[in-house]
Amino acid sequence: MACGGGLYSFIGSRLAVAGLEAFLLGAALNSSMTRPPNRSGGEVPRTFGVEEEFLLVDATTGQPVPAAEACLAKAPQRPETSGGPSLALEVQQEQLEAVGPVCSTLQEVIAGIREGRRLADEAARSVGARAVAVATSPMPATPTLVAQPRFLNMATRFGVTLREQLTCGFHVHVGVNDGEEGVAVLDRIRRWLPVLLALSANSPFWQGADTGYASFRYQAWSRWPTAGPCERFGSEREYHRYVQSLLTTGVLLDEGMVYFDARLSRNHPTVEVRIADVCMEASHAAAIAALVRGLVERAAREWRSGISEPRLSAGQLRLAAWKASQSGVDDTLLHPLLNIPCPAGEAVQVLLSHIRPALADSGDEEQVTAEAARILSAGTGARRQRETMMSTQSLAAVVLEAVGHTHGVEHHGPAQAVPAPASYLTDIPRSRS
């Protein structure tokens, strides 16, 4: 993508100074702030957990198969007190969800992710299928609705939007002290979420064709009336007032259909970040989860220090998310601070710099930085799918290779250093191609 020099001349000193102010503010925050107490009262990392959605596919053809209820009927039942992941239905019979345990460390999260994938695949194998972590089906598919009353009501009301909805997301929950802190976090992480989408992008195909997007799942999901970014809320009271205003329209069936990119959980004292595709590799997913926890921690520290949230509109954020959905990490993104085009590696570096103290405090910095570098160099699941398609000319091969990566055949190319961002004052390039 070409960006004319006039764009950078036009924004000139105004955005450069704004970027410098954000940079200096972050530096001061990083050097002076201590970690706030978490829910248990001690200065320990926040708890977090993940939910992964998988496609169920034929073990030979890669075609989605409507086997979710059959899988769960044969899967061993785990008590809620077991402390491990569990399996659940999603809206379509071609999907299974693995719900991970509450974790304190990145090592616990990645172990839970791998165990959840193992459980899902074990259940799928019991009916001749496999569980695969791709966010849309490369093969053409006609989804089969799970015949539960809520889903049937949704199908009646939303028609083709639900009938065609066969997408797999990755949801990260991070503990917050209360709803007020949670909303303060939501207001402060908004601008960073498109970078997470780019890093997770894993859905280039839809109904047998390359869509031209790295995450077409995000495009398909955006058809829902509440999907996407929100304006800033400012307080817990305003958040709940806004949600109630959506419910009183009668458009939504219930609060479960509040599909913001990030929201307060209805059932747990957590912030839930929902923007990401399910990642092909477990290590990618764990890194995304750690990035989310770092963002939540950084945002809470800013709030406790009285630092106001950024004043970006939902429209600006929608553009950034759209660009991330289109490009993944293979082209330009919108800069999280300046809202202008920049290389994907620069956007990732700015994110890492923003949350580095939080990552260091939780012991995640080295592992997450290395994994981000691998994603940038080796590519996301979207790039992997396209490379397989190019080399084999077979959508079935795309799916079956993804099955292997889902369950441990992880591709770790040589990690490359994440490029440092340009100086906000002197090194803003005059053109990019």
Predicted regions mapped to residue ranges:
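Aromatic (phenylalanine/tyrosine) cluster motif
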Residues: Y8-F10, F23
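Metal-dependent DNA replication initiation modules
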Residues: P45, V134, P138-P140, P149, ...
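Short polybasic linear motifs
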Residues: A16-V17
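Surface-exposed, active-site-proximal loop segments in enzymatic domains
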Residues: L145-A147
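Short, Lys/Arg-enriched N-terminal segments with co-localized hydrophobic residues
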Residues: L20-S32
